[in-house]
């Protein structure tokens, strides 16, 4: 009986070790992902019959301290002078599950998945899946709360740290541009 109890205990310990390994990998991905990334996501916006290409995209990932493989952030596509706006921004909620990064663009109420990627402290490149569209991207890590002192709620401006000025929001009746991902030739 004691032998059976020992075998059952060892089997239970081995099974628990196997079930917890995938969470560790997702946590490591989320930890490395945390911060601000800048690069080309090959995004365009269609507005009033015209298509405008983003010059660069900025993504911010803030890790949830209670659910380590998920969090919030923002996605901003910056445009050149010929577009009727300087940027298109979305708040995001993101989650890493099974190595796939799933991002919910809250204002558009759409989802983007990132898979087949390489991620380290400096670079993030891979494939975006948006509906039936697959697009390659490459981004550089520009800031991280894990790198240096973090001045929460303050911006650096001409040598001094100061609270940011309040922004303005578009009127709710304004027509909004539609985000599209363009495939590379």
Named regions from a protein language model:
Residues 89-98, 129-185:
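Edge beta-strand at a domain terminus
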Residues 29-54, 91-93:
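Tryptophan-anchored aromatic micro-motifs
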Residues 41-44, 74-79, 103-107, 127-132:
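Beta-turn initiation residues at beta-strand->coil junctions
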Residues 1-10:
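Bacterial N-terminal signal peptides that target proteins for export
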Residues 3-4, 17-41, 148, 159, ...:
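Bacterial Sec-dependent N-terminal signal peptides
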Residues 49-100:
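N-terminal glycine/threonine-rich, aromatic-flanked beta-hairpin/loop signature
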Residues 98-123:
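Acidic, glycine-rich flexible loop segments
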Residues 9-19:
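Bacterial N-terminal signal peptides
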């Amino acid at each position: 009986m004691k032998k059976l109890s020992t075998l059952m205990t060892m089997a239970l310990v081995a099974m628990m070790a196997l079930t917890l390994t995938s969470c560790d990998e997702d946590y490591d991905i989320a930890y490395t992902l945390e911060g601000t990334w800048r690069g080309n996501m090959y995004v365009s916006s269609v507005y009033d019959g015209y298509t405008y290409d983003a010059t660069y995209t900025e993504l911010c990932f803030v890790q949830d301290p209670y659910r380590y493989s998920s969090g919030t952030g923002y996605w901003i596509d910056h445009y050149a002078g010929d577009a009727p706006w300087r940027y298109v921004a979305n708040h995001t909620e993101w989650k890493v599950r099974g190595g796939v990064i799933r991002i919910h663009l809250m204002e558009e109420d759409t989802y983007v998945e990132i898979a087949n990627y390489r991620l380290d402290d400096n670079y993030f490149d891979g494939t975006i899946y948006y509906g039936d569209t697959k697009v390659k991207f490459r981004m550089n890590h520009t800031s991280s709360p894990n790198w240096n002192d973090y001045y929460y709620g303050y911006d650096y401006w001409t040598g001094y740290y100061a609270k940011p000025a309040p922004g303005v929001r578009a009127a709710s009746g304004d027509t909004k541009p539609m985000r599209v991902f363009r495939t590379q030739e």
